[in-house]
Structures are given as structure tokens and as C-alpha cells.
């Protein structure tokens, strides 16, 4: 008669959380969120920023540093819609981005009007350094390039994880990453948050962060499949997730605190980036457990899939952790 064991014995006597017990609930919630995100994106679309729609960029040199918020408020009160201001180079140089102006003459007129408002609001004699018009065609190219970059990243991850681990884990990881990006985009669309190049950068960062979480869990699953001889795949997945839970919570918690500080104190320039990261990291932390891992288990992940493809003598591999 085979010796009975408890799942805690597989984890050296420590408590094991039954994560996989809630896999169908997790799949259901994730599925509803994905459908909702896709519908929202289809109905509301995106609030594309000047990086994608085109616009006028005006570089202005100030006599002395001035508050960005003061100049932005003055421009809005003067009737300019959605002006984007940021320092570049030094505290005396600012860049103003405005919606498209018709032709070169329109850009020059717009530059003069913006300069007048800034001079009046700061009580100084600033000068226009450069005026540049970015056409909609350039913005469309940027949008296409950004989408291709996201797709290339997901494809590269699929190839790497499939080679490094196993295709079932690779499928779970890539689906989880796509899940994170789609839901994040759905939330951005829902709240009509402006999509610019910093948002694309934050989405790439979310993919990288979520991938790191999933790789850590996948590596522990592979290690435990080789070390733990008596556990079922269900038990080994739960043991692996329990063992990496502390690391996941600490890493995600500290990361979210830093991003929250960026959101609260980073100003309008970093607001979209930090908000996207807050949403994506939160979703990615959950998906690394309840999408990537649970999906790999549902795809039939077994011990033999993780072991080296060679004939080994019984007991020649790492010894069981059970007596």
C-alpha cells in the first residue's frame, strides 16, 4: 500500500494555498473583463494624443524659469485646447504641443499667440526657438509602429518561453500578457485617457513586468516537477505558487508604491504613464497566477513535459523531498 502524504509535506511541512481551486472563477472573471474591454474599445475608441494625430510643436526659451502649471492654466483660459507643456534641455526651455494648425502660416500664427500668452502670464520676454508641424500621416505611422512593436514583443516571448520551458507554459504566459494589455487598453478607452508614446512605453513596461512574474513562477513549477516525485500536477502548481507568493506580493507592492508616487507627484507629463503602469501591474500580478499558471495546468501540463527527454534510471534524478 502506497504511503499517504499531505500536500503540506510537499512544501516541507508549510501551508500550501489552494490557488487552483478558483481557476474557473478566475477564467470567468478574466473572460468577462476581456469581452468588456474589447466592446468598450470598439464603441468608444481611443483618445489619440498629438503623437498619433499630428499637431504643432513650439519650443520657447524663457528669460527665467517659470511654473509649467501657471503657463498651462493661462493657455487654457485663453482658449487653447489641451496644451501640453514640458521642460527640455534646461529650466529655461519649454516645449508646447498643440492640436494641428493649418499649414506653415497657421503654425506661425499659433506660435505668436502662444508666446503672447506665456509672456503675459510670466511677466517676461520669452522667444520662440522653433515651430514644427507634425502631420497626421506621421502620427498614423507611429500608431502602426507601436502596434507592431507590441505584437513583436508577444511573439518573441512566445518563442523564448516555449524554448526555455514548454509550449503549454508559453501559451499560458503569452495569453496572460495579451490579457493584461487588452484589459489595460479597455480601461484607458473607458476613461478616455489620452494615448501617446509614453502610454506605448508603459504598455511595453507592463509586458516586461508581467513576463518577469510569470517566468519566476514557471521556473519554480519546472523545478518542483523535477524535485517532487509524488505530487500531482495540481498539487505541484499550488506548491509552486505558494512558494513564490511572498516574492510576488513584496515585488508588486513596492513597485506599485513607487508608481503611485509618480502618479501623485510626477505631474501631467507622467500621469498617463504612471496610471497605465498602476493598472497593468495590478492586473499582471493576478494574471501570472490565475491566467498563465492555471491555463498551463488546464492544457494538460505533466511531469514528463518538464523533464529532459532522455531515459534515466529510476532514482537517478534529484531525490524526492518526501521520506
From Swiss-Prot:
Family annotation (Gene3D superfamilies): Multidrug efflux transporter AcrB transmembrane domain (1.20.1640.10)
GO cellular component terms attached to this protein's record: cell envelope Sec protein transport complex; membrane; plasma membrane
SUPFAM superfamilies given in the database record: Multidrug efflux transporter AcrB transmembrane domain
Keyword check for Acetylation: no
Subcellular localization, as worded in the UniProt entry: Cell inner membrane
Periplasmic side: 44-142, 192-196, 271-280
Coiled coil: none
Observed effect of gene inactivation: Disruption of both secD and SecF confers cold-sensitive growth (strain secD1(Cs)).
Claim: Repeat is one of the keywords in the record: no
Membrane topology field: Multi-pass membrane protein
Domain of life according to the entry: Bacteria
GO biological process assignments: intracellular protein transmembrane transport; protein insertion into membrane from inner side; protein targeting; protein transport; protein transport by the Sec complex
Effect noted on mutating residue 213 to M: Abolishes protein translocation
Keywords: Cell inner membrane, Cell membrane, Membrane, Protein transport, Translocation, Transmembrane, Transmembrane helix, Transport
Segments on the Cytoplasmic side according to the record's topology features: 1-22, 164-170, 218-247, 302-323
Transmembrane segments annotated in the record for this chain: 23-43, 143-163, 171-191, 197-217, 248-270, 281-301
Location (main, coarse): membrane
Listed InterPro entries: SecD/SecF_arch_bac, SecD/SecF_bac, SecD/SecF_CS, SecD_SecF_C, SecD_SecF_C_bact, SecF_bac
GO MF, one annotated term: protein-transporting ATPase activity
Pfam family, one: SecD_SecF_C
NCBIfam families linked: 2A0604s01, transloc_SecF
Assembly and oligomerization: Part of the prokaryotic protein translocation apparatus which is comprised of SecA, SecB, SecD, SecE, SecF, SecG and SecY. The SecDF-YidC-YajC translocase forms a supercomplex with SecYEG, called the holo-translocon (HTL). The stoichiometry of the super complex may be SecYEG:YidC:SecDF 4:3:1, YajC is in the reconstituted complex (with SecDF) but as no antibody is available it could not be quantified.
Similarity comment: family membership: Belongs to the SecD/SecF family. SecF subfamily.
Functional note: Part of the Sec protein translocase complex. Interacts with the SecYEG preprotein conducting channel. SecDF uses the proton motive force (PMF) to complete protein translocation after the ATP-dependent function of SecA. The large periplasmic domain is thought to have a base and head domain joined by a hinge; movement of the hinge may be coupled to both proton transport and protein export, with the head domain capturing substrate, and a conformational change preventing backward movement and driving forward movement.
Protein name: Protein translocase subunit SecF
Organism: Escherichia coli (strain K12)
